[in-house]
Amino acid sequence: MNVKSQVTITGIVTDESSKPLNNVQVHLFNTRVTTLTGGDGLFSITGIAAGKYTIELSAAGYAAVARVVDVKGKDNNPFSFQMKNLLIQLEAVTVTAEKKEELLHNIPVSITALSSRQVSEFRLWNIKDLTAIVPNMYSGNSGDERNVTSIRGITTTSYDPSVATYIDGVNQFSLDTYIPQLSDIERIEVLRGPQGTLYGRNAMGGVINIITKQPTNSASGFVEINVGNYNQQRYSAGIRLPVIKNKLFFGASGVFNKRDGYYTNEFNGRSFDRQQGITGNYYLKYLPAEKWAITLNVKHQDNRNHGAFPMVNGIDEAFNNPYRLNQNAVGKMFDNTLNASLSLNHSGTLFDVASQLAWQNNHRYYNPPVDGDFSPLDAVTIVNDFGTQWNNVKVLTHELRFNSPSGKSSAVSWTAGTYFFHQYIPGKQATHFGKDAGMLGVPDTDFSTISTTKGKNTGIAAYAQVNCLLTAKLTLIAGLRYDYENRKLNVFGEYQKDGQDAFVTTPDTAASANFNAFSPRLGLKYQLSDNSNLYANYSRGFRTGGLTQLASDPSQPPLYPYNPEYSNNIELGLKNNFLNNRFSLNITAFLTHVNNAQVPTLVLPEAITVTRNTGSLTSKGAELELSFKPVKGLQAEYSFGYTDATYKSLKISSNGQEVNLEGKKQIFTPDVTSMFTLQYSYLLIASKQIQLVARGEWYYLGRRYFDLANTIQQSPYNVYNTRIGMSSKHLDVFFWARNITDRKYIEYAYDFGAVHLGNPGTYGVSVKTMF
């Protein structure tokens, strides 16, 4: 950029009484420019081009503010900003849902955004804790921490998810390689509805976008301790600091988490699902020159679960004898994940560019094996500890993205990019049938069937999206993405009698398949006023196709291809801010049609998922989100979601016969989700920002089903949480309790009847110091 075209932005930040505010963070959207105000409340930003910029201000104890400023190509008078106490005003919410920084209020997409403060207030430790906070979202697991997530009736039930999860820009490629634990979070964004244009494969239900805190010129850190019942211990810490000011930055955070099991194993009288794990997140950021940034990020998670599948056979057993089971095989799950990325960002005069290369690796195995019959019988166990070369998933991805430049005054803004991935999945698993196998109808005993698979998947994509200002109030959004994927799978089957050599039952066989998909988007946004936006969208998403695995059941042939699943969505939305940013109200209505629906079936006893394309699904509903600060210190939040997700056609095979399940409801999809929170904060000592805080939360989840025939169901129920304590600038002390009434409910169930209950009532104390 020509030096003569560079200009300077200056400004002053004050509070409601016109008192200058010190140490306010000032950030220019979609740039690496961040600075702080001095003791006089003044800030200065140099070396930028003339144009329109969004300036974001944030400071402890104050509601974040964002405002568009028009920077002229000459000396500019200082811009004045006023920040109000967080106790009386809602914050401006920044999101990167569309691959660039924007205000939530201005984006014509259904999004729930949670700030770092809200993540702490809700006490969110795991992605599944977002259930009902996000309208029409449900997430749960069978005790193995691999969450099944449903948004608007689009449900993840296989290792290729239908709801994509991104952490710091990296697609958590499958349930094998994603990290569900939450720590040191900057914000969480949940996009509802198909997001295929910008996010591609497996975003047909939506996207969970998680951003962790990165280091800046301001040194900061925290230490937090949580202790509670069930011997819950959670220790977390983080630090962010400049190594060389304006040049090199370092950040690190980590969590150690352990607890006793919620379940007791009556077979040995011991706690069953004891867990402990370590999660780490490390940043090294380098600014080699003006407008350039290089960021290295490494994440890891190492979990140990002493009883990975705390499940019982049937609903009656689950509720009549809650949190007790009887399993003779107590499998210990080792789950080790490493995710690393290298990002390069440049802000240019013609366009901004971002490149991100990422590597993901997960090795998960059971030692000793896990119980496959969920009973005290020595009948079925699942064995997969065959060394590090097996069940060790590896993924390489690269995204190259271009954006229209920041600050450029134009009626058109755009985003375009390419995406590449390669995935290697070497799997080996044995199903062992013990001396009691005959009691389950197995004609032989003391033998194993061994399935070996090697999968290689490679894909490329190109995408573009344009926002065009048609009039001063009307904006057109249009986008298109093309994805191509090649899948290869080798299968090999063996039979082995205990103490004898194995012999081949299925020779080494290979197959491949190619899949492609177009994902368009078309939308309109109309600005009703400065505080209200109306929008309408059409979007398409898809879940990739694949090849079936190997099972011992001859009716389930291996290497059978199944095609991609597609969702087409139409939605209308209205976003409003009222009463000087004290009241916000967002409303959405949607209609989604899914064709070529993938229906996964868990084949027993091998615990292998076989997928077929069968049927179509229609999902329709509405959503509402409300935030209100009626008086100083009091905040109310409410979310509501209604989903009617019904199969319009669904024919499956059961016991050798075709069964028509037309009219059945989608699984893992509550018909209603509702959440209400009320929090009161009393400012005790203003100079030290000491507040007394009391918070209550109410969750309601409607009826949901866990099998396609709708025979396994959970009736509607309520859950209540609370958080009470003291907050200050440098120290927080809180008592928290979740599921106060100890409500028993089904969190997860397999279609063959195995049931896992949701967490019982838990409580604890949290102490956090910030510096």
Show the residue positions of the predicted features.
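Structural signature of Gram-negative outer-membrane beta-barrels, strongest in the C-terminal barrel
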Residues: 285-290, 402-405, 413, 418-421, ...
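Short, acidic, small-residue-rich periplasmic hinge/interaction motif at the N-terminus
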Residues: 14-19, 24-29, 58-62, 72-120
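Membrane-embedded beta-barrel scaffold of Gram-negative outer-membrane proteins
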Residues: 343-348, 352-370, 527, 533-543, ...
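N-terminal periplasmic accessory domains that precede
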Residues: 78-81, 127-130, 148-152, 166, ...
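Short acidic/polar hinge/loop motifs at secondary-structure boundaries
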Residues: 168-194, 280
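Transmembrane beta-barrel wall of Gram-negative outer-membrane proteins
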Residues: 220-222, 227-259, 263, 267-306, ...
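Gram-negative outer-membrane beta-barrel transporters
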Residues: 403, 417, 591-593, 612-705, ...
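C-terminal beta-signal and adjacent terminal beta-strands/loops
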Residues: 633-636, 698-707, 725-771
